[in-house]
Amino acid sequence: MPGTLGFRELGQMAYEPVWQAMQRFTNERGTTAPDEIWLVEHPPVFTQGQAGKAEHLLLPGDIPVVQVDRGGQVTYHGPGQLVAYLLLDVRRLGFGVRDLVSRMERCLIELLASYGVTAVAKPDAPGVYIDGAKIASLGLRIRHGCSFHGLALNVDMNLEPFRRINPCGYAGLAMTQLSEHAGSIEFAEVSARLRAQLVKHLDYAEQTTLTGGID
């Protein structure tokens, strides 16, 4: 079992600098570099994955669109959504891509269960769902045996921008969020519970909070 998993709490940061930093981290890390997970909220932005098609961007309006190098299609990030970027040496951990996705889904399902919310994964559509509505999205890139990008959990946010796209390429896909199912929630507490679940499902022994920037 690996030892300590490091987390960086980035607060709210624009998407592109974080994306560029995770690319640098992945490109420059050595075979002994510790894994990290970055937790962040983004200002409103649509990100279009490598499989994305222009027709799934219906009416982006004043929200910027960024073409990115993760798998999947278009999604939305905004305030009140908890994003976790998993910067892992998956080769060293011994995870296949499908295994890692399943671990991420189980992490989210157990987090939601801790709030009394029943959620499921779908074998043909990565992510986590409540009664058919999507509450969490997943998208990864593997480079040199290491992962970047990650997951996005809708906690307590404005869901309207999802109606401007076909989320993850699915026309009319309903979106939901934790606040609609669990009443009053604290964002920081959701983040803490996510950290604990990630440590558990990535087979780490413990966690620590990393200091310093990502530049």
UniProtKB/Swiss-Prot annotation:
<keyword id="KW-0963">Cytoplasm</keyword>
<keyword id="KW-0012">Acyltransferase</keyword>
<comment type="similarity">
    <text>Belongs to the LipB family.</text>
</comment>
<dbReference type="GO" id="GO:0005737">
    <property type="term" value="C:cytoplasm"/>
</dbReference>
<dbReference type="Pfam" id="PF21948">
    <property type="entry name" value="LplA-B_cat"/>
</dbReference>
<feature type="domain" description="BPL/LPL catalytic">
    <location>
        <begin position="31"/>
        <end position="206"/>
    </location>
</feature>
<protein>
    <recommendedName>
        <fullName>Octanoyltransferase</fullName>
        <ecNumber>2.3.1.181</ecNumber>
    </recommendedName>
</protein>
<keyword id="KW-0808">Transferase</keyword>
<dbReference type="InterPro" id="IPR020605">
    <property type="entry name" value="Octanoyltransferase_CS"/>
</dbReference>
<feature type="site" description="Lowers pKa of active site Cys">
    <location>
        <position position="134"/>
    </location>
</feature>
<dbReference type="InterPro" id="IPR045864">
    <property type="entry name" value="aa-tRNA-synth_II/BPL/LPL"/>
</dbReference>
<dbReference type="InterPro" id="IPR000544">
    <property type="entry name" value="Octanoyltransferase"/>
</dbReference>
<comment type="function">
    <text>Catalyzes the transfer of endogenously produced octanoic acid from octanoyl-acyl-carrier-protein onto the lipoyl domains of lipoate-dependent enzymes. Lipoyl-ACP can also act as a substrate although octanoyl-ACP is likely to be the physiological substrate.</text>
</comment>
<comment type="pathway">
    <text>Protein modification; protein lipoylation via endogenous pathway; protein N(6)-(lipoyl)lysine from octanoyl-[acyl-carrier-protein]: step 1/2.</text>
</comment>
<dbReference type="InterPro" id="IPR004143">
    <property type="entry name" value="BPL_LPL_catalytic"/>
</dbReference>
<feature type="binding site">
    <location>
        <begin position="70"/>
        <end position="77"/>
    </location>
    <ligand>
        <name>substrate</name>
    </ligand>
</feature>
<feature type="binding site">
    <location>
        <begin position="150"/>
        <end position="152"/>
    </location>
    <ligand>
        <name>substrate</name>
    </ligand>
</feature>
<feature type="binding site">
    <location>
        <begin position="137"/>
        <end position="139"/>
    </location>
    <ligand>
        <name>substrate</name>
    </ligand>
</feature>
<dbReference type="GO" id="GO:0036211">
    <property type="term" value="P:protein modification process"/>
</dbReference>
<dbReference type="GO" id="GO:0033819">
    <property type="term" value="F:lipoyl(octanoyl) transferase activity"/>
</dbReference>
<feature type="active site" description="Acyl-thioester intermediate">
    <location>
        <position position="168"/>
    </location>
</feature>
